[in-house]
Swiss-Prot record:
InterPro entries: Ig-like_dom_sf, IZUMO, Izumo-Ig, IZUMO1
Disulfide pairings: C22-C149, C25-C152, C135-C159, C139-C165, C182-C233
Miscellaneous comment: Izumo is the name of a Japanese shrine to marriage.
Originating organism: Mus musculus
Residue intervals of the Ig-like C2-type domain: 167-251
Bilayer disposition of the protein: Single-pass type I membrane protein
One of the protein's GO biological processes: cell adhesion
Protein name per Swiss-Prot or TrEMBL: Izumo sperm-egg fusion protein 1
Keywords on record: Cell membrane, Cytoplasmic vesicle, Disulfide bond, Fertilization, Glycoprotein, Immunoglobulin domain, Membrane, Phosphoprotein, Signal, Transmembrane, Transmembrane helix
Disruption phenotype: Mice are healthy but the males are sterile. They produce morphologically normal sperm that can bind to and penetrate the zona pellucida but that are incapable of fusing with eggs. Spermatozoa show impaired adhesion to the oolemma.
Amino acid sequence: MGPHFTLLLAALANCLCPGRPCIKCDQFVTDALKTFENTYLNDHLPHDIHKNVMRMVNHEVSSFGVVTSAEDSYLGAVDENTLEQATWSFLKDLKRITDSDLKGELFIKELLWMLRHQKDIFNNLARQFQKEVLCPNKCGVMSQTLIWCLKCEKQLHICRKSLDCGERHIEVHRSEDLVLDCLLSWHRASKGLTDYSFYRVWENSSETLIAKGKEPYLTKSMVGPEDAGNYRCVLDTINQGHATVIRYDVTVLPPKHSEENQPPNIITQEEHETPVHVTPQTPPGQEPESELYPELHPELYPELIPTVAQNPEKKMKTRLLILLTLGFVVLVASIIISVLHFRKVSAKLKNASDEVKPTASGSKSDQSLSQQMGLKKASQADFNSDYSGDKSEATEN
């Protein structure tokens, strides 16, 4: 902490200049700076320079919005959106420093760079606001809600320009709808607007109120020649004044040609599916060449013109849908056939097994019966042999 550290503090002090503390109008920034002073600085800087550093930080933040260039004059006010963007960027950089846990000279360098960087960001946002957002109306009177950085107060800023927003030429065909549009791009953002009033302006400069309300559009259906002429739209404010005035010069054209309508020989697609055969009339006293196959002259055939040409993409989607449906039907049918075939094969196998069982039992019974008959015959043969032996013995005696 030698002379080099003192030079860093001097460089930080050179950036100071009293200005409008625009970014400090946000409560989140104020709370973050208090936490930064009471928590972070006590652990990362000596106590003897702690207060001086924090005083310079507060002055540097207060200088946000001071534009040094002569061609850029700062109004000293921003809208809520610009202030939110600047606040988010400042808090993000401040958190990055506290998370880095820097100390001593390196901490002072990083803090100095961050303050200069955030000051440039705020100035760029302020310039962008003044060029693109502040008073975007090219005509009329617009009221914007701005935050004035000197006192951190919200006030209405009046953008006064010419009330006359020009004349619009409108052409409409007879029996069509007439639409008068009185909405401008900045009307939604302006404050203190009330009602739209539409007037019919006559040749003697007198006016007749046609409609009044919150809607910026006037629609008149089935216009005729009597609707041609001059109209006027006036947007009122809560101060009983006018915000915008728009004039309209309406011309009613003849109705569109009948050839643009659907010709009588056009048939629909349903009628095209069932074509009608036209047979030419035969003059009296003259027979057709062939009653079975009459030949018609090409001019006698009706001209078939489709009403609407089919969209190729829609046609392709329809075909794909049909193919998918047919594929699903085939898949379901194949599954059903497979299940039925499996059941049929299972039934056949079951019947075959049932037939094999009685045959095996019958063969076993026949074998046992043959064994019993053999035993019976053997026993009878033994009996006959015994009887013949006894008989021979009796004869000998």
